[in-house]
From Swiss-Prot:
Expressed by the venom gland. Probable ion channel inhibitor. One of its GO terms (cellular component) is extracellular region. Residues 1-21 form the signal peptide. Disulfide bonds join C52-C66, C59-C71, C65-C78. Keywords: Disulfide bond, Ion channel impairing toxin, Knottin, Secreted, Signal, Toxin. One of its GO terms (molecular function) is toxin activity. SUPFAM superfamilies: omega toxin-like. This is U13-theraphotoxin-Cg1b. Its main location: secreted. It holds the Pfam family Toxin_12.
């Protein structure tokens, strides 16, 4: 009984290693494409950063924040400036 359990565990271990190696080999081609994907995502986030920052968005000056928001110097985030006008 102990021998059959050990053989079963050994076979499962070999199958796991074999499946992991096959998956690694298959995903190797995906890793070559990932820098282009990361660059496109970076462009998306950079374009959003050029617009005004919404509530609790990071900022360095008041002009970074949207209307009715001001840059709070304590933690550098956009917060309501207390105004109600349009």
């Amino acid at each position: 009984m102990k021998v059959s359990v050990l053989i079963t565990l050994a076979v499962l271990g070999v199958m796991f290693v074999w499946a992991s190696a096959a998956e690694l080999e298959q995903s190797g081609s995906d890793q070559k494409d990932s820098p282009a994907w990361l660059k496109s995502m970076e462009r998306i986030f950079q374009s959003e950063e050029r617009e005004c920052r919404k509530m609790f968005g990071g900022c360095s000056k008041h002009e970074d924040c949207c209307a009715h928001l001001a840059c709070k110097r304590t933690f550098n985030y956009c917060a309501w400036d207390g105004s109600f006008s349009k």
